[in-house]
């Protein structure tokens, strides 16, 4: 019981699975960063409007420069996300290709084993024997067909028709035994005696 429950199951998580998970986590973090930067850009744009209304043009200009730099960061972040997603797709497709290759390898191994069991020579021998059997049967059919004349064929058909007619005309044989018949001219007292003689015989 201890061995049964104490044995650890072998992990099916591969290095490729770990890499895909890590790449997706980085992608999600970049998207969160994008969202945060986008919200900040909206606030700074509103603040720049307020500064211009207040006549603080230089301050508004400086704020817009910062905003422009953050927009460039946002574009670079989008490119990084695209690269991460492309990498994830490449790894996943490579995993599919590996599965296909494993299937092809297994199929080739099965074919090789089957070829070892039945070689080309064995297949050719079986085909030759089959062809010989077919040819032998064809020769027999030709001999049988050539050994009868038209008169023989007519006689065979006539006999077949006669047998068929006999089967039609013959009465059916009763399946139950016939009842014992006692002659009417025998006296009544003598009838039991006659029945005993019949039974004794």
Curated annotation (Swiss-Prot):
Q: Where is this motif: Type-2 MIT-interacting motif?
A: 168-179
Q: Where in the cell is it found?
A: Endomembrane system; Endosome membrane; Late endosome membrane; Membrane
Gene Ontology biological process terms from the UniProt entry: autophagosome maturation; late endosome to lysosome transport; late endosome to vacuole transport via multivesicular body sorting pathway; midbody abscission; mitotic metaphase chromosome alignment; nuclear membrane reassembly; plasma membrane repair; protein transport
Coiled coil (UniProt feature): 10-145
Partners and quaternary state? Probable core component of the endosomal sorting required for transport complex III (ESCRT-III). ESCRT-III components are thought to multimerize to form a flat lattice on the perimeter membrane of the endosome. Several assembly forms of ESCRT-III may exist that interact and act sequentially. Interacts with VPS4A; the interaction is direct. Interacts with VPS4B; the interaction is direct. Interacts with CHMP4A, CHMP4B and CHMP4C. Interacts with SNF8, VPS25 and VPS36.
Membrane topology term: Lipid-anchor
Q: Which InterPro entries match?
A: Snf7_fam (IPR005024)
Region (Disordered) residue ranges read 171-201
Record note on modification: ISGylated in a CHMP5-dependent manner. Isgylation weakens its interaction with VPS4A.
In the record, Phosphoserine modifications are located at: 119
Pfam families registered for this protein in UniProt: Snf7
Protein name (database record):
Charged multivesicular body protein 6
Can you name the source organism? Pongo abelii (Sumatran orangutan)
Is-annotated flag, keyword Secreted?
A: no
